[in-house]
Amino acid sequence: MIKRYLITLILLCTAGTVLYTHYQTYTNNPWTRDGQVSAYVISITPRVTGQVTQVYVVDNSKVKKGDLLFEIDPSTYVASYHKALANQKQATALLAKAQNEEQRARKLEKRTHGAVPALTLSNLHNAVQTAQANFELAKANIEEAQLNLDFTKVYAPTDGYITNLNVRVGSQVVANSPVVALIDENSFWIEGYFKETDLAGIAPSDRATVTLLMHDDVALEGKIKSIGFGIAKKDGITGNDLLPTVNPNFQWIRLAQRIPVKVTLNEMPKDLQLRVGMTASIKIIKH
């Protein structure tokens, strides 16, 4: 009987020790399975309206900064550019004419005082200023027409991955309306949600270990980039405050809120590709 009690006591002590060790490990190194891979997503938006004539990429392809993505029919913008050039020539001629008329009148007035009324000289001077303004406006119109012509070619603003490509040859695109997303290749991070009670003693630059659900046998080393300073309230009026909304797991009991923590990886294995939205687990190593 005593032997049985001793065995039970030993088992209870062992279980208690294991539980205490795990608790201490979790307290010193909090972890969460509620993590996701994130990255900056750039909306590729044409600056001009028109019909797409060429598409040089396919969905989910990799591109380099400066790669040509697609072209918009330039016909209208070529015509506008030539029209702006013609208007500048006309404005140049009118400016030269106004300047010559003013110069002749002033020379005549200089030779014979009173030969040209003061009002006429004033009107001629105003005509020159108006012609000069029209000339500057014509120059600006040329610059605008040239920009619009350049905007018919849409380039990748950074290295990254094309996703959600919704444009084809013949599609009509509208200025300032996104047509494709570009995931910035150099902006990946892991975002995990930790209970507020787990963040005591956690600081930016603390080390972290990340495990992806897709590659749970590979531990990725990283460090904390930032800790969220606010989340949106679940209930109540918050307005358009742009704070992240983190829904609690349970509604019927009072639980610690979850705060977003961003982790950047120190190095990526060459055979491992991060994708936005992948599930991840994060373990923080306190200093």
Task: List PLM regions with ranges.
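Extended amphipathic alpha-helical segments
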Residues: N28-P30, A79, K83-A86, Q90-E101, ...
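Aromatic-capped interface at the extracytoplasmic side
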Residues: I7, T14-V37
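Long, amphipathic coiled-coil "stalk"/hairpin helices in large membrane-associated assemblies
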Residues: P30-N87, F151, N164-R168, K195-T197, ...
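Membrane-entry signal-anchor segments at the cytosolic-membrane interface
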Residues: M1-L11
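Short hydrophobic beta/alpha edge segments that flank linear recognition/processing sites
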Residues: K64-K83, E143-N148, V173-G192, N240, ...
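A structural signal for short beta-strand/turn segments enriched in small hydrophobics and glycine
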Residues: V52, N60-L69, A138, A145, ...
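Elongated periplasmic alpha-helical coiled-coil
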Residues: Y40, R47-V48, V78, R104, ...
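Hydrophobic alpha-helical membrane-insertion signals
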Residues: N166-R168, V179, E185-H287
